[in-house]
Regions:
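A transmembrane-helix-recognition feature enriched in membrane-embedded lipid enzymes
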Residues: 2-46
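Residue-level signal for inorganic ion chemistry
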Residues: 27, 61, 95, 125, ...
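Walker A (P-loop) phosphate-binding motif
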Residues: 36-87
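Conserved beta-strand elements of the Class I
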Residues: 77-81, 140, 215-219
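Phosphate/Mg2+-binding loops and adjacent switch elements
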Residues: 86-192
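G-domain G4 guanine-recognition motif of GTPases
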Residues: 171-180, 200-205, 219-223, 246-251, ...
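Redox- and metal-dependent alpha/beta enzyme cores, enriched for Fe-S-associated oxidoreductases
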Residues: 210-253
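A short, acidic, amphipathic alpha-helical segment used as a generic capping/interface helix at domain edges
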Residues: 250-266, 275-276
Length: 276
């Protein structure tokens, strides 16, 4: 059973649940701190990693795909590497429809395949926390609305690493809906003055096909459903009902029947994300 993101992860004020998780957070932090780091340089091929330190919903997969498209227009032979997870077939399918994808249980096996097929640049969708690989360029993606949530490490908060780890990376990508990023930029520069900061804004490519004169029931099983809803609202899409499922949710026939029935009862159209 997949669970939704805990609400207290994005609570800006200290709360009891986070405090109760502190002992486990400290334990996991110490394990990570003393884990042997063997940063092997990836030979024979250039590598770019697009990852995050806030777990889920930061826009790294769309950014990886767009980065791949840009490099292809520059005539580079590219591919995207994603570690295989049985419960992430939605992202695997999304990427494979748009780019050459290597998706093995071990990233090193995907690297070997890319080299064998004479790729010039490989883009890792996720992988910043894999300590035995040293990438040529590393991007850290954030969602500007959530930023770092409550600022605590897992499981008390949503962070895989604290902000001090930004000193190890090449650039930050702030994905959002046009929110002010001044405070975020200042925080980033405290930990790495030289780091490059890029900003993107979510812009649905097929928004003109969606009639804003109609009512919509929307549903999604993504890392940040609030951003999906906000993007539609900014484009003047009238949302009557919003249904939220866990990230990487595997929809059943019964789920689809319920969604269709609810839309029929509400007399609305149905709208979801490309990944869903």
């Amino acid at each position: 059973m997949k669970l939704k993101k805990p609400y207290f992860w994005d609570d800006k004020e200290l709360n009891l649940i986070s405090i109760l998780f502190f002992p486990l957070t400290i334990f996991l932090f110490l394990i990570n701190l003393f884990t042997f780091k063997n940063n092997n340089k990836i030979e024979k091929i250039k590598s770019i990693c697009v990852g995050n330190i806030y777990i889920g919903g930061t826009g790294k997969t769309p950014f990886s795909i767009e980065l791949n498209n840009i490099l292809k227009t520059l005539n580079y032979k590219t591919a995207i590497i994603k570690k295989f997870y049985k419960n992430q077939k939605d992202e695997q399918k999304l990427i494979s429809n748009k780019a050459k994808l290597y998706c093995e249980n071990k990233r090193i096996d995907s690297i070997k395949k890319a080299i064998k097929e004479k790729k010039e640049i490989i883009i890792f969708d996720d992988g910043l926390q894999q300590k035995n690989l040293n990438y040529n360029i590393s991007f850290v993606c954030f969602n500007t609305e959530n930023w770092i949530g409550n600022g605590f490490l897992l499981p008390a908060g949503p962070l895989r690493e604290n902000l001090k780890s930004l000193k190890n990376y090449s650039a930050v990508v702030l994905n959002g809906n046009g929110e002010s990023t001044k405070k975020i930029r200042n925080q980033i520069k405290k930990y790495n003055r030289k780091i490059k900061i890029f900003e993107t804004k979510y812009n649905p490519i097929n928004i003109k096909k969606i009639k804003n004169s109609k009512d919509y029931l929307i549903f999604s099983g993504i890392g940040n459903p609030a951003t999906f809803k906000k993007t539609l609202m900014q484009n003047k899409i009238k949302i009557v009902k919003s249904m939220v499922f866990p990230d990487h949710y595997q929809y059943t026939n019964n789920d689809i029947k319920k969604i269709k029935k609810l839309a029929k009862d509400l007399k609305t159209n149905i709208l979801t994300t490309e990944k869903d």
